[in-house]
From Swiss-Prot:
Top-rank EC class of the record's enzyme: transferase
SMART domains associated with the record: Ubox
Pathway in which the depicted protein is active: Protein modification; protein ubiquitination
Statement: the UniProt record of this protein carries the keyword Electron transport: no
Taxonomic source organism: Arabidopsis thaliana
One GO biological process term: protein ubiquitination
Protein name in UniProt: Putative U-box domain-containing protein 58
EC number(s) per entry: 2.3.2.27
Length: 420
């Protein structure tokens, strides 16, 4: 019986090798758990615990051939486990041989239930040599019948393929005829496209001519634009030159004032303040003109300072000569000088700064005047505070400022420093 069981298991192993897929294992080592391993373990547990027999088999749709194979496998397993005709090691080896799929995945659960329900009944079945040989012969007949059915199926598929091939040949002939007609149409279309291409080439030549004329015009405009840019650069250089001249005049003016103060030691309390300019230009036409005006003003101031210095030197020489010859008249001259100083101080106290010295926001004399985009001059701290609070309009005109850049008004600042 054991030898016949080995033969049957070997045949079933070959026939059922690709029938059932392996199941992923939940174990840490990652081995594949097969369906046979699962239901054989269930079979052993049921037989050892003498589970109750199931009367009715579940309704499971299984292919007839696979179903008979399944029943044969179950019967042999039941006989082996019940009678214990082989050792535990041999049974484990047989189980390892049978660790291959039998049914599709969707039928795994039903097949397991079917096996568990019938394993108790089939375990009581006793095989005789005649019945076992008949079982083997019937399995061989089923195998031959399956092979014959497979051959018939393949022959039918070959005949269908031949019929489809004939249809494809007829279709290719029809396509060839239609291709010839299409070729004639394409030749006509090619001639039409050739005429269209010639017209397109003529149009392209005309377009290229117009494009060349337009390029010449663009080149002329570029030359004009470069000329304008050069003029702007020259104007900017002139502005920088006038600014440098203005700064040089300021340095010369300070040197002249220092020299004047040295020459007038005896008259140092008398300060003749010359008002250079007291007006404010609300709208500057250009930066070049502004610096040019400042340069001319500073030049005139320097000339006046030099003239005043020379006059003071002459007067000082005359005074020194008179002091040498007229000691008596020196006291009178000193009294007259004191009176002149007193009169000058009174005039300076009565004199009020011009309105251009006051900030339109704070209404106080400015210390750091700056130009804004609206053309007005403001105290730097006040106008920055106005802009930082979110205002983008002029405090004087209430119009939107074109930009928020502030420019120092150096000329006005110098005039304020001289007067105050």
């Amino acid at each position: 019986m054991v030898e016949n069981s080995y033969v049957l298991f070997a045949r079933l192993c070959v026939e059922l090798f690709h029938e059932l897929p392996p199941l992923p294992s939940d174990e840490s080592h990652g081995d594949i758990t097969t369906f046979e391993r699962l239901f054989l373990r269930k079979c052993r547990i049921e037989l050892e615990n003498a589970s109750p027999k199931t009367e009715h088999l579940p309704l499971v749709y299984v292919d007839e051939t696979n179903y008979y194979r399944f029943i044969k496998t179950v019967r042999v397993l039941a006989e082996v486990y019940k009678n214990s005709k082989i050792t535990e090691t041999t049974r484990k080896s047989m189980i390892q041989v049978l660790m291959n799929p039998i049914l599709p995945p969707e039928r795994i659960t039903d097949a397991m239930n079917l096996f568990r329900s019938i394993i108790g009944k089939l375990a009581d079945f006793h095989f005789s040599d005649e019945k076992f040989n008949q079982l083997v012969r019937s399995s061989r007949v089923v195998e031959l019948e399956g092979n014959y059915n497979e051959e018939v199926k393949l022959r039918k598929e070959a005949e269908d393929a031949l019929a489809m091939k004939k249809e494809d040949v007829e279709m290719m002939e029809q396509l060839l005829e239609s291709y010839k007609e299409e070729q004639g149409k394409l030749q006509l279309q090619a001639k039409a496209l050739e005429h269209k291409l010639e017209a397109e080439l003529r149009h392209r030549k005309e377009t290229e001519t117009l494009l060349a004329i337009e390029r010449d015009r663009i080149e002329k405009v570029k030359i004009q634009l470069e000329t304008v840019e050069n003029e702007i650069d020259n104007t900017r250089l002139k502005a920088e030159e006038f600014e440098r001249k203005y700064e040089g005049e300021m340095i010369l003016r300070r040197e002249s004032e220092i020299a004047l103060e040295k020459e007038k030691k005896e008259l140092e309390e008398v300060k003749l303040k010359l008002e250079t300019y007291e007006r404010e230009q609300e709208n500057l036409s250009s930066e070049v003109r502004t610096w040019q005006d400042k340069y001319e003003q500073e030049s005139s101031l320097r000339k006046l300072s030099e003239y005043a210095l020379s006059r003071e030197q002459e007067e000082l020489q005359i005074v020194k000569g008179l002091l040498e010859f007229y000691n008596g008249e020196a006291d009178a001259m000193r009294e007259e000088r004191d009176k002149a100083l007193k009169t000058a101080k009174e005039q300076m106290e009565k004199r009020q700064p011009p309105s251009s010295f006051f900030c339109p926001i704070t209404q106080e004399v400015m210390k750091d005047p700056h130009f804004a985009a609206d053309g007005f001059t403001y105290e730097a701290e006040s106008i920055r505070k106005w802009l930082s609070t979110g205002h983008q309009t002029s405090p004087m005109t209430n119009l939107r400022l074109s930009h928020l850049t502030l420019v120092p008004n150096r000329a006005l600042r110098s005039a304020i420093e001289e007067l105050v």
